[in-house]
Regions:
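Metal-dependent amide/peptide-bond hydrolase catalytic core
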Residues: 1, 48, 212, 216
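Acidic/His- and Gly-rich active-site-bordering loop/insert found
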Residues: 3-108, 113, 117-120, 124-137
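Histidine/acidic-residue-rich, glycine-tolerant segments that coordinate divalent metal ions
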Residues: 86-88, 96-107, 113-114, 129-216
């Protein structure tokens, strides 16, 4: 059995847990920064798999970091799992056409219930593979709020949570199973301060330095 076949078998072995988690998040349908039940469901599922849980990283109430280490000296692999529902995208489950729920404002019509569940499946499968094979590594799964209209990943980046990662994986459901070749725009803000040097414009203009020159 190849490594890929082994990992596929490990994913299939936990498929019922993955589906159950996805359905829970679907039914919770919580908007960005208010995904309390979704975050708890995902962190509880990872805790049951032996992951240590850090709650509220960077002060985000609906975020967590789940970590599992096998051996010593291995790489750090991070999976980003998100679970925010979106406004105007409620949907009756199991229906191929758009059937919004009359009493629901938010929903997972964009498949964000799968974002967290899929990352859960990947993190657990890699953890199980490391345990079975003795592969040294650390697996982390970030429970990340506000995939849209908020940017939970920005807070993780600003807090240094990606600094020790050797690889970071995120995904989004779509019409095909592929690796995206598209680039993504960052939304991290950076503040620069440019300082000049004052001088008399008539007598000693050569002694001055314009901060605008650097800014331009």
């Amino acid at each position: 059995m190849t490594d890929a076949e082994k990992i596929n078998a490990l994913i299939c072995a936990k498929s019922a847990d993955t589906i159950a988690l996805s359905e829970k998040i679907w039914n919770f349908a919580e908007p960005n920064w208010r995904e309390a039940q979704s975050a708890k469901a995902m962190s509880d599922a990872l805790c049951a798999e032996g992951f240590a849980i850090e709650h509220m990283p960077c002060g985000m109430q609906t975020a967590f970091v789940a970590s599992f280490t096998s051996g010593t000296g291995g790489p750090v692999i991070v999976y980003v799992g998100e679970y925010d529902a979106l406004s105007g995208l409620s949907q009756e489950a199991g229906m191929p056409q758009h059937l919004p729920l009359a009493d629901e404002k938010y929903g997972h019509g964009c498949g964000h219930n799968l974002l967290g569940a899929g990352s859960f499946a990947a993190a657990v499968a890699l953890k199980d593979y490391a345990v079975e094979t003795g592969l040294p590594l650390t697996v982390k799964c970030f429970g990340c709020p506000a995939e849209e209209d908020g940017g939970g990943k920005v807070f993780f980046a600003r807090g240094g949570y990606f600094n020790d990662a050797d690889a970071v994986f995120a995904w989004h459901p779509g019409s095909a199973n592929l690796v995206s070749g598209q680039g993504c725009l960052a939304i991290s803000g950076v503040l620069y301060t440019f300082k000049g040097r004052t001088a008399h414009a008539a007598c000693t203009p050569f002694a001055g330095r314009s901060a605008l020159d650097a800014a331009e």
